[in-house]
Structures are given as structure tokens and as C-alpha cells.
Amino acid sequence: MASEQDGFLPAATRGDSNWSGVSGWESALSAMRAEVPSIDSDDSSLSDCEEEELHIFQREDTNLIPDLSIELLDDGELNSEVVTRQMSLEKVEFSDSLEPSPNVCVPLSVQKAELDDTINSRNPETEQLCPEPIDNIQTESMVGIKDSEKEDGFRHVLHSSVTTVLKPQINSNVDSEYEIHPGNTEKEHLSTSALSSKPVGLSLQFLECLEQWDLNALLHQLKEEEVQEREMPPLILSMEESTERRHKLIMEKLVEFAAQQSEEVSSVPQLEEKEKEGTISKSSFRPYPDQKMYLKGSGKHPQSFSTICLDLRTTVSKMGQVTSLEQNPENPSQRNEQKEKHHLNKTDHTGKSLLLRNRHNIQNDSLSDANMSNSESLSKEKKELGTPTQRKQRPKSKVDISPKLQEMVGREEKDGREEQEKEKEILQYLPPKSLINSRADEFAQREKQEKEKKARLRMLTQLEDLKPRSSVNGRQPMAEATPILFHPETSYCPGISSLPDVARSGVETLLLTICLSSCGQVFIPGQHGARSSYPSLFLANTFHCLLTWLISLVPGVNTHGKVNAPFHVLGLQQAWQEEGLALYACLSPRQIATQSSPKIRKHKGKQDLRGTSSFYQRVSLFLSHNTLQSVIWWSEDVVERLQGKLFPLPTEVPAVRLSSIATLNSAPEAVEKVFSSACGFYWQTLETEEKINPLLSEIPTDSETEVVSVIVFERMLSNPTAFHHTLHIIQTEGLDVCGVRLLYPQANALHSYIDTVPSSYTGGDGQTLPVLALALRGTQAEHIWAEIAGPFDPQLARLTDQYSLNAMYGFKRGEPIMHWARKSGRLLQELSLWFGGRIPPSGSFNIGFQNPYSRSTQPRSANLRSRSDSEKDVTAFHDTDRCRPPALLTASILGDVFLVVSPAVPSAAYGDVIDICLHRGFALYGLRRLRLSAKRSAMLSMSSTQVSIFCPNVPHSQTDAQPCRQPRLHCFLLLLRKENAAHHTSGLIQALMNELAERGLLGAIHAKFSYICEVDPSFCFHVAPYTDNLLQSLGGSLHAMPDLSTVPMDMLSLRPFASDPEDEQVVVLTMSGKHTLRRAGYFLQKILRPTLKTPASNTGSVHDGFELLGLKWLPSLSRLQAKEITPYEVGDRPWQRSIEHLISNPALLCALRRSNAFAVLQHTIKQLAPTLGMEHPQLIASATPEIAFRQAALIFSDRDLVSDPESRSSLMYIPPTGINCRAGGTEDRRGTTESIFTYMLSGPPVLYTVLLLKPRIWSSALGKILYKVHQQKFILVGMKPVSLTTAMCSQILPEDVKKSEALCLTHCDYLTSGPCLALCLQRRGAVLKLLDVLGPEDPELCRAQDQFLWRAQYGTSAVQNGMYGSTSYQAAIRDIKTFFPEGLLFEESTVLQAEQIPKLTSDILVCSRSHRQTVKNPACGPELPTTDLPFTSALCQTTCLLFPPHMLRTSPPPYIPALEQLMAKEFHITAARLTAFDQLQAQLVAEMYSPGNYLTAKIKLLTEGPCLLVAAQRDNAVTCFPSLVHSDDRHNMSAQTLTEQVLCPQTESQANKMLSCFFDSLTPDSIHQILH
């Protein structure tokens, strides 16, 4: 320490060559070193001794008062000090921005701002003249102590009786000194002397050198150099007191000084005006040129801070041998020089310093006058204070002052008088002394609080650095949402007792331990009970029953009196230790009449009870003789509470004895270790037997896990039914009980923690009631618990949420049954209060070795070397004990499970399934649709009943009359991940069943199981834990991409895609991004089963939902996939950002199908997830069929895309799936599957349907009807008049009509009243399209729906509705076989070939040997003049027109306008038929129409395709046919077509022959009949 002190001594005491001293100085200095405190202490030492030190004040140099060592002292105290200061003969002028005027109070913030501006605006010349601030001038002390420079902030250095000497070096050989001698007068004597090598007498060497200087040249040089303006640094010197009175006096003045410096004093408006007028004087100080070189060479930073040194200790200084100075300088010239020196030094202070000095003078008016120079009183005072004797000075009568210096001194005297007047004005505005003291106390309190806050933040930082980074054994990373249980307030308050006072009064206690396999699950070793579908549910129910039972045994809570256990439960808590997670209970004997100890029966455990207490034996026998079912007497009440639920979780528990679940420990230190040991500040992540997919271990779950702290009061704890019901609801809602602790808080402490406390906790009777602290953990735990608990007011809860806990068990608002933090800001505080550790007063505690696994594979030496810096630097913790302290809050590692959805659940509910899983906190990591075999079901541990449901077979027979309803064969497989996943699977299944019931989907499921009364959850869902072998047996990776090499080349080539919106289209939907995937189930639910109607499509589809073809979840997309999926083009600006977003986020991709799929899906996306203002859309749909095909080929394989017959809206209007295989003659015995890729390329197949025009409709409107048929893109492949029988009529009647016999008879009478015209139409989706354009059966409903529907135009009533259309695909095939048994006129068709419908190649009526004859209709004869039949004129004729094939093939077909032209010319059609001729028939027909003329050409024309035969009647229809057609407009194209291209008879006999050859019947209103 001596060497260090020597380093701080000034150059004079270290033997500097420029300093001459004697042994007297050295002896004085050596005597004082022992009393001087060390100045080299670091910050850490200061922080450790904060209570022992008194930190007065610290401020930057610009805001401190310079040189307050004189102003703070009284005149008497000034007499006890000799302040020696070296001053230059020139002054450096300070600017107003650097130093406030002595007459104006300037705020400190303004001073600092002005100082910064001044420093920034310095010019290089000024820095060269004065590169070092004034406070860096070398200081010397007569006792040998030098102020040390600050190294790391302001350092308070204490030393005694320091006299500062500011010594500028003029040159290497000459030193000068100015001494200020405060005497009994107010005048100060200015003297100059040179330092000599002798202790007595002063050398005149300095004065001799001074006489040789040219002061005029020196002043001129200083004016040119523009010296930088600076403020004299402050220096508060320590005072050495000899009495207690003086010690208190200096303390009061220091407090006053600190208060004035810390608070801004408002200035007077008059002073502000004077400052603006420039009346404030400026002080200046200029060093010598040689002094500037000394400062430049000192090497100190210009902005370094000075050290404020105070010595508040009352130490006794040692007298040293010093040189004596003359006490009565009588030389007048010396007094004048001192007076000039006083004026020179006076302006070196700020206004505040001068103000303080004047105030000291006013307060000490009682002291002796400043002009007195009584040497005896001075000498006596110095002896009392122990001040060294002053050195004598030689008279300086020979020294002459230059005229310029005298002028300067005169100016300063004038300025000094003005300053004194201004100081008197300022004194009246000073605050009172009491206010200064209160502000000082407030400042000290704030400083203390700030230090405590910083210390606690450092503690938090150290705890964060040592936080566990993984699970207890390092298998997985630390669970999320596990904050450090540290709070700046609660962690320093006293801990809450976990045992009552009676447990510490010497009563016998036992430790009951119940091992837990995970949070909320009891570990039962050697469990061999009956096989259960939900083994985890049994373990959870066991935990609920045990916890409720132990709570019911707590004294003060047990009010029901139904307990027969021989013990009380005093303490209860769930804690993790190195041995694992367990529920601990402290047992004590009951305070009732002593029971006789039962005899120990002879059994195997008898040896274990020897040497134990009777209490231990009673408890042990009770546990071994009772089961859990026998002690839960309230179980039936809990079952009654669950009756209102649709699918409540069962509450059964395994029939095991309590001794197989719990163990006893009679050691006294066992209870002490569990309930009295200091708990830790960290969560621990418990490891279970669950596994996760290693390929997906790096993908975060992002499950929004939250924690809730709940305090259960005595009213709830005393009701076992209520508490057990609460635990059951927590399990049902998917929350983990991660912390349980029974506490005994004091009444006043409990009121300070909780706002509203029940009245039973007032503590008036001296009894401390317990509370139970629960910590709940799960996804959105705060929201879920708020719904479970309900509103705080029980009356309001009963109105708004009758199933909440407050509604069922609450009493009144002022008597709560529970408390939980409703504000998220209080969560950490409450967790730290109830479950966190405490910081001891010493600040040293054990946190154990939190990450031992990370160094278990390294040598011990390597482990020590690899320790992080945070662990090395922590001094408050002891990690020598590698055992981790108990953790009262635990989380579980992540686990994967397979959820299998049976085929009985419709695919339209898959969105609901995904949404419930995500809502319950399960993260989605894979999807697949697959068929289960018996082997796979066995690996999934399914029961025999489940196998028959999850592995259905194909039905063997189907009726042709009903639509093909092939059952769903594929299951839906999901890979889910969650903390403690196996524990929550039972609650997940229960939530899924409730969701299906609320959506109304259980009816469809129950219809498939007609042999059962209720739908069991096991029929719909099955859960299996994840294993790698199970994943491989289920088809391998769920994220496998298709192999593009297996795709046929013709699929990848350029080709047209079916894009008709009326057909079924396949579209690919992509959901990308974590935020989007959280709502993926909701989006899919609205798409598959929409509740809002989408805009009506042109097809008028009867179902608005989509058919789900494929689902796939991918952890990320490849760049090739992202380029196909992005909605932007390459030239778009956001294209690149969209690609990066897609490849860096998981995605869920769906393949969907329905009619007009692209337009409907785009409209749905706009409603669900608007993209306005979003750079990355949440939902991306493929824009065209070609893009959809490319996206599907990159993502799905042909096995991944599976059609869903039950959810396909158009299933009954399309052929069955295996139609192609049946056409080829091959069929798989397990059923055929549709290739979606083939469907996307070829589109839907061409179908056929039957349109039946009912009697008296088609004869007058056939042309218009055929025109409408052509408008809807139908192709006519068959047409013939048919006469219906009763059997035929019943075949085409609707099902609701068949139920009424009278209504059925009415329909049959109408249908048999005349021939109907049957038309067979061809197009894609023909069946559904025809039903769409026909409309409802009732024409009135048609007109209300759309007036352009066909039945609305041609129907008159529900019976005479005009038309009939095939109602399904199977009905269409049946109608074709009924009305067209001879076949149809079609090209090659796979559907008709599969349905065995022949192709018509020749006409079945045209024959040369036909015996049919055409005769006049008797009903139209002249003997019946009153008949209402039309066309009864004698001139009426019937013609037979033949439309050749070329008129039917072209588009638009010319035959339709020709028929309309006939209708316009009042022709009445009596028969029409579409037929085809072979070669012989064509020759016969050609000869009939034009015998001998162009026979060969006509034969060729007739055999090119189908021909249309039409029988029409009118007056002169045969003889005047050309003139009738051209009568109005000869330029009409339809008329020209009829005359030029249509074949017509020339004579009436020829026409009659044709009618008998081509038709077998005519309409009843025809003038002719065909006789057979």
C-alpha cells in the first residue's frame, strides 16, 4: 500500500529534481501516510461497502463549483488552513457558455449543454495553447497526498488536511508560487517567492527571473493565440476536526452544498434582464506559455473528471516539522500584492461559489474583523486545530509590478465591488435550510433505491445466464414459457411457510411420497389391470382422486367429518428433485382420542414395521388395507356433475391399493428436506417415455403456451366434490397441473398479496388457514382458465355461464373461492411469490449444476475450462454442489402421437378435427389418407371392434335402381406433437366428439352403425404413441415427395386442359406461414362445409362444398415448388420475397374438387382471408387447370389423391368409379380407385340422359325446345315418339308422388293420354345439367326461382309440368334401356359400352316388306263437325320431311331453324324420329323421294350419319309445300334450307307411303293413322 500511495504523491514528495526539500518535509509526510486511506480501491470494493461509505454528490466538471475549499469554510476555519495556489500572471477568459456568471443562477442542464457546444467548437489553436483542462494541473499537498484521477467513474477518496498547490512549471530551472494567507482581515496579501532548498526562508530566485520578463510582449502573444476558455475544476478538500462540533458543522455545509447543486434555483426576472443586457462580468485566467507546454505533455485526456475528496472521519493528525512563515507581514507592498491576488482569484469562481462564500461571511459576522492581525489568537487557534505552522515569507518590497498588471488589477477591483452588490440581491432568493435538507434526503433515498434496483437487475442477469437450457437429462431443449421465478420485490421478501406451526413443535411427522410419471399422472409400478383404451386417463384420474383425498385431510379444511384415515395432512406440495417428480405430503397423528393400535397381522411386510413408531404402523397398515376407490366417498357426486356433458370423460380409477401408489418415510430429516429446503428459481423439464420424430425435432411448435397461477381458498378446499370436479375440468380442457403447493400465509401478508380475501382468513382467532397454490400450463391457458372459472361475481356467473366454477360453487362477490392473476403483468410476481425461491440477506445461495448433461461426455478438466464466462464471474452462487435444488414448477418434454380418424367420420369434418387439435395445443406435423389393413391395425393396438370399423370392405352387390354409394375406405392419419401428449389424448378425443355432435355430424355416423345404440368415441378416433417402426409400417415419411420420373411423358407435355366451369374441376390450395396454419382447420372447415352460401354458379350445383382429394403438411417447400405456387410472375417486384417466404415456412396443401372450382374458391378466399394490403397472401389457390396440374404433380402422388364418394356432391349424377375397369373387362376385387391425374387431363366423361316431352307439349313447340337443347350444348343422339304404359309411368314418377295413390293415378292418366317424345341427350355432366335447366317439379316453384327454367315455360301444373328428366345416372341408364332398347346414335363411348347399350346402325322400321298402311283418322271426318281437333279441313295434308345428316352435324345445326320455320308457317308436327339407314335402307329411301334422279348421290348422303324424320300436317302441306315456305320472304335462309336441302314428297300418295314406312304411330290429333 505504501508503494501505491507513493504513486499518488506529488512530484515534490517523490524527489523531483525541480523540488528542493529537507528532512522535515519527509518526516511529516511519512507520519501522515499511515492515516491516509487508500485511493486505489476499485468499484467492487466500493459496492461492497456501500453502507459504510457516505456518497455525497457527484457531477461532471462543468456543473461543479470550482475551488470551494475556501467558500465552504468559516473565517475561523480559514485561519486554520493555508491554501497555497499557483496562479499565472495572465488570466484565461471563460465564455458565458462554459461558466455561469456569479450574479445569475443558471440551471445545471443549461450549463452542461453550453459546455458541450463550446467544447465542440474549439479551434486547433486553442487546443494547442491549453490542451489539458485546468483540473489536470499537477497538485501538491503539504502532507503529501495527491488527488488521484478517476479511472472508472467518480471515485470518493478520503484524506485529511490537504492544502492544494497548483504549480505550473515556467521552465526547467525556475518555479514560482503564489500564496494566499487568510488572516483576520478581509484583505488578502499577494506575495511572490521562489522555492529554495532550505526549509527556513524563501529564495528570491523566482523574483529575479520575473524581473527579466517582457510583460508587454507576453500579453501580446497571449492575445494572438486565442486560448480555449475553460472552467476551473472543483476541488473539495477534506477537513480535519478536533471536536464533534466542527464535525457536525462541516456535515451541514456539505448537505447544503449538495442540495444546491442537485436542484435548480429559479432566477429572478431582474437578473435575467441583466444577463440579457450583458452586465454580467466575465472572469478569465491564462496560463504561462511554458505552463501550456507542461499541460500538453502531461498526456491526460482533456475531458477527464476531477475527484471530489472528502474526509468525514475524526482522526488526529500528526504534527510534522514544517517551515515557519511570518505571521505579521507588515510590508504595505506585500498587502497590495495580496489584494491584487485576491481580485485575480475572485473571478475564478462561478456565481454559486461566490454566493456560498458571501453567505458564509454573513453567517459568521460574529467572528473577528478581517483587518485584524492578532498573531497570538491566530497561533492559539492553529494549535487547537493541529495546523502546521506557516512558513515565513520574506518581504517583497523590492518587487515592482508593471503598469499593465496594475491596470488589470484595478479593473478586477471594480468588478469585484459590482459582484458583491449582485450577490447581496441573490441571497434573498435562496431556499430555506429545511427545504435543502429534505431535498438532500430525497436524493439520498433515490440513489439508494437506484442502487438496489441495479443490484437486483444484476442478480436477474446472472440467473438468466445460468438458466437450464435443456430437459433434466438433456434429451430435448428446455420447454417454452418457463420464465425464471425471480421478481425484484417478491424474491427478496420472506418466504411463505409450507407447514403450520404445529409441525415444528415436535409433533411426530411422516413423509408420504407419490411418484408421478408426468404432470398430472401417477406412476403405478407393476400395473397389470384390465386393458383400457385410455390408459393415460386412468393415471390422470388417480392423480385427481389422490390430490383431492389428501386435501380433505388437511386440518381446518376437513369440515365434512367423513375421514377415517389415522392421520392429518399438514403439508402438501409437488416438487421435482434429482430422484424425479413426486407429490409429497407431511402426515401427523390426528388430534382426536387415541385409538388402540391394531395388531400387526402376519404377512410378508411384518419385518418392515419392526422398530417403527405406532403412528407409522397405523399409517402403513391403512395404506396397505385400503384401495383408492374405498377412500373417495364423493365419486358419485362428481359423476352427477358431469351428466350435462355430451361425451364426458369417465372418472374410473384402477383398483389398486394405496400402498402400491404411495410410500412412507419416517426419517425426521425427510420432512425437513422436502418442506424446509430452499427451492430453486428455475423450472425443470421432466422427461417421459414419449418420443418425437427425430427428423422434425428442430421445427418449433409455436403453440402459444401460457401459465396461470391460481390460489384456492378454504371454501373450495373443504368441498371434495367441487375440488375434484375442478381437476377433472382442467384435464378435460387440456391444461397441465405443473405446480401444487399447500401454504400457510399470515393474514396480513395474504391481504397484501391478494386484493379480495375471504373473511375466514382474517386471523382473528389466531388460526392460520391454508391456501392451495396451483400452477396451470397449456396453450392459451389464461383464456381457458377464465372460461372455466367464469365471472368473479357468482350471481353474474349464474346468468352468463352456468357451468363455470363460480356459478356452481361460488357464494358471493366478497367471499371468493379462488384467486388468479387477471393481469399478465402480475403473473411472474405471483409465480415467484408462491413457487419461487428467495434471495437470502447474504446474497449467497445454491443453484446447483443446471446443465450437467452438456459436459458429461468431456473430461472434468475440459468441463472446467469450457465453463461459460457467466458461470465463472458469478460470485453470489455456489456451484460446488452439483445437486440441483428442488423445483416447484415442472414442464414435460414434447411427445408425438398418431391420431387415426375412422372412415365413419365424413371428410367434410376433417377441418373441424384439425381445428380442435390446434386449439387444444397440439402442433400438426404430418397428414395422410390411407387404408388400414389388419396388420396395421394390430400395430396400432386396435380392438377387434375397431378393426371392423377402421378396415371396411367393399360391398359385394349394388342395385341398379339406386345411385352407387360406395363406402369410404380410407382413414385419416395425423401426426401431432404436444407437451405431455399422451396425458392429453383422452381430453382431445372427448373434445372431438363434442365438436362432431355440435356440428350435427353424429347422425350420419350413427346411420352407418345401425346395430348399435350410441356412437362410442372409439368408433371414430384412435390414438397411438409415436415410434419409428410404427411410422414405417404406416407408409414411411409423411412428407415424401412424388418421383417425377414415374409420371408419364404425355402428362408433362403441352396439351389442352378441360376448363369448362360447369364441369368438376380440381384446384390446389396452399396455406403457408405459421400464423396461417394456426387457423388452417378453420379455413378448411369453411371450404369443405361452408355455412355462408357462395355465389350461384351457372351449373346451379345442389351442393356448395368441395370434395377433399388430398392433404399434405410440409415443413417447408422446395424452391421449385415455391415457384409453381407463388401467385406472382417472375417480373413482379414481390416475386422473390414471396419465394423466400414460401421456402422458409411450413405449408398445408389441399387438393379440392367441385364444379366451377376456381371461381368459387377465389370468392371463398376473399371472404375468409382478404389479401388487401398483404404482401404474402395467407391462402393461395391455383389460377388455371394447367397450374393446378403442375402443382399437384410436384406435391402429391397418385396414391395421395383419393376421391371421396360420400362427400362428392355430383356422385349420383356420374358413373361409378370402376366404370373404366368394367368396360375393359377387369375389376379389382378390393374395389377400384379413380386416378385424379387422369381426370385432370381428360376431364369428366361424356354422359347420357333422357328428356321426355309429355303429351301435347312437343307437337307445337318442338323447334323451340330443340333450340334450347342446343343452347345448353346438348347433342341429340336419340329421338322417338313413345306411348307410355302404366309401368312406364310409375318408373318416371317422383318418389313423393308414388306415396299417394290418387296423385299417382292422376299422373298416369295424363302420361297415357297421348304419345310422348323421348329425347336422348349427350354432353359432359348431362344428367346434372338437364336437371338444372328443368328446375323443380312444380312449375310454380320454377317461376319463383327462375322464369327461364324449362318447366316454368312449358308447364302448367304439378301434373302437367311438360317435361321429365332422368334424376340420376342410374336412372338415365334405366330410361335409355326402356325408351331406346334398339340403341343410340353415338360414337365410341366407354360409359355406354360399360352399361351394354348398343349403337344404332340401321332403322328398325324401314323395310320393303312392311304391312303398315296410312289411313284417314275417323275422328277427323266430316261426320264430326263439332270436334275440337285442329286441322279438320278437307284440304289438310300430312307430309313427311327428311333432314339429311349434314343438317344435323354442322354447328349451328340448320335443322333447328328449319323446324322453327315450319312452326311459323302453321305446320303441326305429328311425329318425329331420329334414325340411321344402312345401305339397303338408304337405297329404298332414295328411290322413294326421287326415283331415278341422282340415286347414287342420295344413297351416299343418307348413309353418312343420323337422319331426322318429321311428319307435319297443314292445308296443302304436300302439294303447295315450296310455295308455302317462300310465301313471305324469299331471302330467308331457313326457307331456302327447307326447299333445297330437306327431302319432301311430291304427291300425297307418296307422302302416305313414307308415313307408313317411317312411323308406327302418329299423334291423336293427326288426320292420318298408321294401321299394322
From Swiss-Prot:
Residues 324-335, 361-374, 849-865 have a biased composition (Polar residues). Interacts with DNAI2. One of its GO terms (biological process) is outer dynein arm assembly. Residues 1249-1382 are annotated as: NDK. This is Dynein axonemal assembly factor 8. In cyliated cells, dynein axonemal particle-specific protein required for deployment of ODA to the axoneme. Interacts with outer dynein arm (ODA) subunits. Its main location: other. It is found in: Dynein axonemal particle; Cytoplasm. Residues 336-351, 409-426 have a biased composition (Basic and acidic residues). Residues 1-21, 262-304, 324-428, 849-871 are annotated as: Disordered. SUPFAM superfamilies: Nucleoside diphosphate kinase, NDK (SSF54919). The keyword Cytoplasm applies. One of its GO terms (cellular component) is dynein axonemal particle. Disruption phenotype: Mutant multiciliated cells show a severe loss of ODAs from motile cilia. One of its GO terms (molecular function) is dynein complex binding. Keywords: Cytoplasm. Expression is enriched in multiciliated cells in the epidermis and the nephrostomes of the pronephros. Gene3D superfamilies: Nucleoside diphosphate kinase-like domain.
